[in-house]
Amino acid sequence: MKKSKWMLGAAAMLALSVALAGCGGGDKKDDGKAAGGVKGDLMVYTSIYPDIIDNMCKPNVGKAFPDMKVNWFQGGTEKVVTKITGEIKAKKIAADVLMVADPSYYLKLKEQNLLLPYKSKEDANVISDKAADGSWYAVRVCNMIIAYNGNKLKPEEAPKNWTDLADPKWKGKIAMPNPMLSGTAYVAVGALADKYGWEYFDKLKANGIRVEEGNSAIQNKLLTGEYAAAMILEENILKLANTKKEPLKVIYPTDGVINIPSPIAIFNTTKNPDGAKAMVDWWLSKEGQEAVVKGWMHSVRGDVKEPIGSVETKKLVEGRIKVDWQKLADNNAQIKEEFRKRVMDK
C-alpha cells in the first residue's frame, strides 16, 4: 500500500482531537451540500468521551446542521473497531463517519477500499497528517505523556523520561492505560517497544506497573497518591488542572512525547455523502478546531493555538517519538499479544 503523507514522518503530527468540547456551530452556506444546508441522517462512530458528546458535541453540531439528524455511537477505540469489524463481515456498515483514536486502523480500512476519498475544502489548512487522496484527515492530535501529583512530588523528584519509570524507586507506584482497550495506549506500546525493545516492558513489569482500564482510574489514583507517576493522555491532565485546579502536572518526556494524530474518515458505503463531507469540513474548519482545543487537545491547523497549559505544538512535534504506523496496522494482534504476555500475565 502506498504510504500516506503522514507515513513520511515529515508530516507535522500537530494537534488535536475531536473529542472536542464545545463543538460550536458551523457556517451556513447557500449551497445545499454544505454545512447548514445538508439533510438526512448521519451516523458517527467515535471514541470521543461521552460527556463531551452529550454536553457539547450534540447540541453544537445540531446547531451547525439544523436539518440533519446526527446520531453517535461512542466507545473506546477497540470497542468501536470490534463493532465495525462485525459490520464489515456482515456487509452492513452502519457508520457514515468514523472518528477513533488509532491512526493505524485507517490504513487498514484504506487497504480494504472501505473509505471514501474526499479532498476537503479545508485541505490546505491541515498541516498535520492526512491521506494524499483525502480518504482520511487527522482531526485531533493527542499526546501521551507522564503525569504526577504536584502535592506529592517536587518537580525535581518526578520522572523526566520514559525510561525513568523503570527506576526501582517507583516500584509499585506507576500505571498505564490498557492497550487492549485504548487506541492511544496501543500506539504508545508500539512506539516504546520500537524505541527501547520489548525488554523495556519487562522492566516495567518487574517494577510493578499497573494496567488500568482507562485514564479516569489513573488520574484518580494519582490524586490519592496511590500512583506516583503514570503514562496518560495530556488532555486529561490539562482539563483537571485548569478546570478543577487539581495539582496534577504534565511531564513532557525528554526522550519524546508520543503524538497520536487521530483521524476522521467517511465510509464509502454512506447513504449521505453530502452530509458526511460537510461534517468533515466543519471539524477541520477553524471553528471546529478551536472546539477541539477547548477539549484540551491540539489542532491540526497552523492558525489555532495549543490548549491552555500546554507546550507549543511545534515543539512537541519536533521532539516526538517516531511511530511506524504501517507496522502498527499490520501487526495489531501480535503487538497486543506480546504486551499481554510480558506485562499482564502473572
Residue ranges and their predicted role:
Residues 1-41, 346:
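Short, low-complexity disordered leader/linker segments with a strong preference
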Residues 26-97:
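Conserved N-terminal structural module of periplasmic/extracytoplasmic solute-binding proteins
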Residues 43-55, 73, 77-78, 93-227:
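Extracytoplasmic ligand-binding site segments that recognize negatively charged/polar headgroups
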Residues 104-108, 228-247:
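A ligand-binding cleft/hinge motif common to bilobed small-molecule-binding domains
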Residues 116-122, 135-138, 163, 246-258, ...:
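Short beta-strand->loop
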Residues 142, 172-180, 203-204, 211-212, 246-268, 282-306, ...:
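Periplasmic-binding protein-like
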Residues 147-152, 190, 260-272, 282-283, ...:
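A bilobed periplasmic-binding-protein/Venus flytrap-type ligand-binding module shared by bacterial periplasmic
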